[in-house]
Amino acid sequence: MGKEKIHINIVVIGHVDSGKSTTTGHLIYKCGGIDKRTIEKFEKEAQEMGKGSFKYAWVLDKLKAERERGITIDIALWKFETAKYYVTIIDAPGHRDFIKNMITGTSQADCAVLIVAAGIGEFEAGISKNGQTREHALLAFTLGVKQLIVGVNKMDMTDPPYSEARFEEIKKEVSSYIKKIGYNTASVAFVPISGWHGDNMLEPSPKTPWYKGWKVERKDGNADGKTLIEALDAILPPSRPTDKALRLPLQDVYKIGGIGTVPVGRVETGILKPGMLVTFAPAALTTEVKSVEMHHEALTEALPGDNVGFNVKNISVKELRRGYVAGDSKNQPPRGAADFTAQVIVLNHPGQISNGYTPVLDCHTAHIACKFAEIKEKCDRRTGKTTEENPKSIKSGDAAIVMLQPTKPMCVEAFQEFPPLGRFAVRDMRQTVAVGVIKSVTFKDTQGKVTKAAEKAQKKK
């Protein structure tokens, strides 16, 4: 095997019928974790149901159905390999909670793959005011996914098939609006593909002889190639934030006989080690970490991306809960927020939102009602320039700077400092009505319990 490949995460976005499932299914199918037996089983079922033409998407539909029913399917199924990377598809839209997942997402996407359909009338429908293409691309950019690849799909459906003119027309149009959102188009690869027939997916297609390939220019190195898989291979690897202060949002807290209290969560930034003194915000509890485990193995250190359980002394299960955040007591420990100011983009709210609105916010693992205390200004989504001071209300499509107050103690951070703790989804009426990125936080100074174990550990030092 040699050296382990780097793991990267991608999110696949685009309008409902653009062929996301087929394209993604094709990659997983050809380069991925699905074994031949499963594929043959799927194909047989698809044929029996008269869905022969649907095999790649069918693979994905089967996986999605299992995922939605809460069957934890083997995550390997959502992975595929390129020459350089192990790629995990962290979510594909169409999934009910896609937007929420993308924000509170267990992991940040390193790159978004935008699929647009080239078929007659299809591209126009996807990019129209109420199509999802713009919304998804805007979301990806707002949430800090700065690398983008565009797959111009269904090239077999253009008139004439594999039309260069149609590809160029779409490329021009998409470039113009992703540029408005904030993407640098020089660094975006455009690839004409057929997710169904496989053109330019893994091998250059003889049907697009006019296509000379994609080129990207960026300060971290230029790249070029002919296919979608090569474009994925040219993604810049993420820098994992080990040099930042520790932030570990708790997913659960267990009581384990003979061991004690074991909080579980994913290290978002920094490093967690046994022997460390940790503070849990917003409760300001401080104690010592006795041990750290991942997949039932003891670790000497846990790094960003690791899902771990760690044993803490002198703290009962009742004192900790999901949504609390653990940090290093000696290095920028996390604190509860009195209030915070965020840029909020309203996606789909049926009415007007005004001061006093109190929906539930999902931020990292926290799920807490927060009050829109003061809508300070409306702003242009792209430039961030103020368009109206102290507006009475905001509605779908608006972006605004808002001061929010949590109704219960809550730990959040500025997006600039700790991205995973600085983006949130606003949930109301069982849907995501808005998304936000936190600009600044007013912290509370809370005096909390310091356990005996922590005091002892401090004396030793």
From Swiss-Prot:
GO molecular function per UniProt: GTP binding; GTPase activity; translation elongation factor activity
GO cellular component terms given for this protein: cytoplasm
Domain tr-type G: 5-242
Coiled-coil residue windows: none
Chain positions covered by the region annotation G4: 153-156
Region G5: start-end pairs: 194-196
Keyword line: Cytoplasm, Elongation factor, GTP-binding, Nucleotide-binding, Phosphoprotein, Protein biosynthesis
Residue(s) carrying 5-glutamyl glycerylphosphorylethanolamine: E301, E374
Pfam families for the chain: GTP-eEF1A_C, GTP_EFTU, GTP_EFTU_D2
Residue segments, region G3: 91-94
Function: This protein promotes the GTP-dependent binding of aminoacyl-tRNA to the A-site of ribosomes during protein biosynthesis.
Family: Belongs to the TRAFAC class translation factor GTPase superfamily. Classic translation factor GTPase family. EF-Tu/EF-1A subfamily.
Protein name, as recorded: Elongation factor 1-alpha
Organism annotation: Apis mellifera
